[in-house]
């Protein structure tokens, strides 16, 4: 991930939407990106609320991570505060981004959860999925096996085993849907994180790589961004 100056911007990220920034920032990553880009502020309740210069699938994935991440993990997203505005591209590129987010989620988010749940063969199949068709098929198998194991564990009173299997079913179901909806790719990480918290780092890396596909945001001067964020914090934006 490219190094930036986000660590000195002193902006707090929160889950949910926010009508206006507070003295410490207090917005989601998409709202913070609006401020940093110098665009008129708006509350973001869904990725459709983002300005048209924001890539829809990348905005949806970032928003999904923002709302699902624990407070201690969410600051990782400030690495993208300058990269969402100007990322919108033609439909073919946006479709490529959706496919990348989904395929990467199957290959990199599901395997550690599947291993933990005692499904190493499925974990290896996810890791080695060569394309979207294979990844969808493996995710479908994982969702079915996770659901079946969760039910069987519940009948035996094996609650922890059942919880892991249920997490597999939830995350794998989201992975299958992610090929049509980028927000569901974030739900893959959310479903796995209860048992494999390190997946947040993987999810952030996936977003970083997805932002390298197609059009990229123009670089901005640090001083200009700092002034915009300071003005928003003080209510002058």
Which residues are covered by each model-predicted region?
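Short, glycine-biased loop/turn motifs at secondary-structure junctions and
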Residues: 1-237
